[in-house]
Amino acid sequence: MIYLDNAATTLQKPQAVYDAVYDAMKTLGNSGRGFSGAALGASRMIYEARQTLCDFFGGSDPSRLVFTSNATEALNMAIQGMFLPGDHVITTQLEHNSVLRPLYAMQKKGVELTIAASGQNGTADFDAIEAAIRANTKAIVCTHASNLTGNLTDMPRMGELARRHGLFLIVDASQTAGVIPDRKSVV
């Protein structure tokens, strides 16, 4: 079988993934539910995973890492939990529905939204994004790799833009985290 939509659902997984899931289902308990060997094993595994991911993404504090069931839930949590009526958010034309739908929902609740045009080559237009910044702008929300064009956003540049203006940066790295070898291009 030739499966061409791997980035969306990752149909074929390495055997080690199946083995780890089977082992977890067979031997682990619920983290934080007591001091049994199974519960402590689950807590230890979560701690180690949190530390590994923090190191991978260059974080400084693994306790600040939050696990969700998937990227869509994480994006919804960040977008719906961060903005209040009157806040302004900038996103791009390149975004996936997992970013756009919660932003539209927040817009109905009084959050101001600007969707910046993309450049001619289907990448983020940094000039358009910077021109959209206002006094009440709180964040830029953008994808690292567009599922529309396949192009990458220059995240170090986007991060510098956000820092320069004191903005939060929410990155949808669903298509690239763990795939792009240079994590510094993601964060």
Language-model features: where?
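Pyridoxal 5′-phosphate
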Residues: 1-185
